[in-house]
């Protein structure tokens, strides 16, 4: 499964470490645990960044990264078990607990979760501490990438 990550170019070297997620947490895990959030399409990767960007200045110098993780290394979250507020603008502790529990019990590298922005599309949470994660770093490809500034203007 080819997965995509859009990151500031200055963070490319640490893009697969999970350090940012460890420091700040995320919708699907608690602070203190390394995690790497990726999307199943380039357009979703862009939207996942764009939702947090409010300034044309921030749209420069991005890198698009891809990684190839075998599907047998990826679990799928049963969305029918999610609470009604799973996609609230401010992540609920319930989704953080769901993801954190997966990190504790799973031996897989990734967990497919729905996007809170486009619920019919998926993100994947990668566990950089998983036993075999390092084997797939050599599949990473980089392409410099710019986001069309009209997308931010449309948000205003």
From Swiss-Prot:
**UniProt keyword Secreted present:** no
Which InterPro entries does the record match to this protein?
RES_dom
Question: Cross-referenced Pfam families, in alphabetical order?
Answer: RES
What does altering residue 115 to A do? No longer toxic in E.coli
Which EC main class describes this enzyme? transferase
UniProt keywords (A-Z) are: NAD, Nucleotidyltransferase, Toxin-antitoxin system, Transferase
Enzyme Commission code(s) on record: 2.4.2.-
GO molecular function terms noted in the UniProt entry: nucleotidyltransferase activity
* Effect of substituting residue 27 to A: No longer toxic in E.coli, E.coli intracellular NAD(+) levels do not change
**What is the annotated quaternary arrangement, including any partners?**
Homodimer. Forms a complex with cognate antitoxin Xre.
- What family does this belong to? Belongs to the MbcT/ParT/Res family.
Main role?
A: Toxic component of a type II toxin-antitoxin (TA) system. Expression in E.coli inhibits cell growth; bacteriostasis is neutralized by expression of cognate antitoxin Xre. Expression in E.coli leads to almost complete depletion of intracellular NAD(+): NAD(+) levels are partially restored when coexpressed with antitoxin Xre.
Know the name of this protein? Toxin Res
């Amino acid at each position: 499964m080819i997965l995509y990550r859009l990151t500031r170019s200055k963070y490319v070297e640490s893009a697969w470490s999970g350090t940012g997620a460890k420091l700040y947490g995320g919708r699907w895990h608690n602070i203190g645990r390394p995690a790497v959030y990726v999307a199943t399409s380039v357009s979703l990767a862009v939207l996942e960044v764009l939702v947090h960007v409010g300034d044309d200045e921030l749209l420069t110098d991005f890198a698009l990264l891809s990684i190839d993780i075998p599907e047998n290394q990826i679990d799928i979250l049963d969305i029918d078990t999610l609470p009604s507020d799973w996609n609230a603008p401010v992540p609920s502790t319930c989704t953080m607990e769901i993801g954190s529990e997966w990190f504790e019990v799973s031996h897989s590298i990734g967990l497919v979760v729905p996007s809170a922005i486009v619920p019919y599309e998926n993100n994947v949470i990668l566990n950089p501490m998983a036993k075999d994660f390092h084997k797939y770093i050599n599949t990473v490809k980089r392409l410099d990438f710019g986001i069309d500034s009209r997308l931010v203007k449309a948000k205003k």
